[in-house]
Amino acid sequence: MTNRYTTLFANLEKRNEGAFIPFVTIGDPNKALSFEIIDTLVSSGADALELGIPFSDPLADGPTIQEANIRALESGITPKDCFDILTKIRAKYPHIPIGLLLYANLVYANGIENFYQKCLDAGVDSILIADVPAHESKEFRDIAKKVSIAQIFIAPPDASESTLKQISELGSGYTYLLSRVGVTGTETAANMPVEDVLTKLREYNAPKPVLGFGISKPEQVQQAIKAGAAGAISGSATVKIIQNNISNKQKMLNELTYFVKEMKAATLN
């Protein structure tokens, strides 16, 4: 199978566009609506998906995404339900890259190889383990390679050159570039400049860098693309739309549609 990320970035480059990638937690606010939400993100123009599996202690997430985890868990969602939703999304959208963003404990609890295999079977393209830096990732990387899943690494803005070099050599799929250090979300807005990090990643021939953390407005997407990123990920801002419209499904889906269209439009050069 041709790598879906490679195909996506090549197609976007031809069209002079960047990627817009929304993040949501699978199962938020419940299993049935979660599928509709993810379906809406794709049909509204998302280029790829970054999805979380609910976890009781999401360390690196800001309050918005922590609350999404709690909502999903309280609705009774299980990892099996999450894989069911992923399988349905993959069946409906054969070409879109699907990435998971999660924590090591969740992977360990299921057994690394078993978990990666389940991800592959459900149509997942990449896994980013938020609390495992590149230099500690060997056991995950080896299995990712074995089952042909891209292992994604985070490049922090304060990373040393040797760390950036390592991320470039070990990562595949794309590189998750942090726009700042700390927890995710628009609680503290993204601060550029990341140009220096982008220059280094290009120099080391890293997988395409996508900027995340604190991306909530079209102009931030524009800035990211202008700075040389291949795209932008928006998590907290997407999840906030779910949170603000819990009791009004139609309004929620309408607002998500508008948000994705507006953010995607900002990737056009």
Swiss-Prot record:
Any coiled-coil regions, as ranges: none
Superkingdom of the organism of origin: Bacteria
Keywords assigned by UniProt, alphabetized: Amino-acid biosynthesis, Aromatic amino acid biosynthesis, Lyase, Tryptophan biosynthesis
EC number(s) from the headed UniProt entry: 4.2.1.20
Keyword Lyase tagged: yes
Gene Ontology CC terms: cytosol
Nucleotidyltransferase is among the record's keywords: no
Pathway: Amino-acid biosynthesis; L-tryptophan biosynthesis; L-tryptophan from chorismate: step 5/5
Protein task: The alpha subunit is responsible for the aldol cleavage of indoleglycerol phosphate to indole and glyceraldehyde 3-phosphate.
Assembly with partners or alone: Tetramer of two alpha and two beta chains.
NCBIfam families: trpA
PANTHER family: TRYPTOPHAN SYNTHASE ALPHA CHAIN, CHLOROPLASTIC (PTHR43406:SF1), TRYPTOPHAN SYNTHASE, ALPHA CHAIN (PTHR43406)
The name this protein goes by in its record: Tryptophan synthase alpha chain
Protein species of origin: Francisella tularensis subsp. tularensis (strain WY96-3418)
